[in-house]
Amino acid sequence: MENRSRFASEDFLSWDKEGREVLVVCVAGRFELPSAGRPTTQPLRVSEAQRPPPPADAYWGEPEHSSPRVEGQRVYTRPGTDVYVSGHAWAPGGRPTREAAVGVRVGACRQVARVWGPRVWQRGVLGLKPSTPRAFEKVPLHWELSAGGAGAPDNPVGCGVYASVSAAVDRPLPQLEDPERPLESPTQRVTPVGFGPVARHWPSRRALAGTYDERWVRTRAPLWPEDFDERFFQAAAPGLNAAGGLRGGEEVVLAGMHPDGKVEFHLPRVHLQVESRFRRRKETRALVLDGVHLEVDEGAVTLLWRAAVPVRRDLAEYEGSVVREEEGRP
């Protein structure tokens, strides 16, 4: 594949839900975030060092016991546009505090959380209650610090939810909570607040992958099951997938993620297309923006675009593809 854009790209073969072979082209464009505390309408600078789309998931620790750091991009489609955020919730001005707020807004996507210093469940007159939070300067925006625990379908690596009251004594509470639905009991089931990708093996996402049973082995393997749901390819936390898709130009506000104040800007407007040549035909596809990764600590944002070109049993006649940026479009 010939890449004439300013960004990094990869291509790979896959099958779609109907079992048709497709050539997938994915482009990752990395840009520099503006300074905190200074809203800007100026275009973001393209980073000098571009990184290819990550081929596989990467985790903060062991995959079975930690949350994803990066979502792998070897998928043929993604409904809507995912927004992922990695970084920290900061105390205002970087001065230690016991409680703060953090939030992100990208177009119509929005996520907010109350941030606490470290707390544990402690015995009280009427049962267990949260201890007084200790002061903090910054808190990682990881699922491990949100509500959940072993057996929780939405967040099995989280904390604060336990099998029994006795099992919760002196055990940690979440440091990231829904401000409108805080955890009030160690056996309560609440919806966790997250900013990073949801792991594909967590029950809430795995349920969309379809049924892999004896019938599938006999009639479909290695294709996707008949009950496969393409929403399985969505990895964004609830509230951070734009169902109608983002197109570029949307306003972005990051609050509480930098000690110097809000980070405010607009997503870059980039239009990409791929032209794939076969011996007897040519296919042209526009790449769709289906991922935005805000790496606040690194001062960068990565946009991910994707297109799937039908192969139509012509793989032996495939001659190559060219990725271009379309100039002059609004």
What spans do the regions from the language model cover?
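Extended intrinsically disordered or low-complexity segments
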Residues: E2-P330
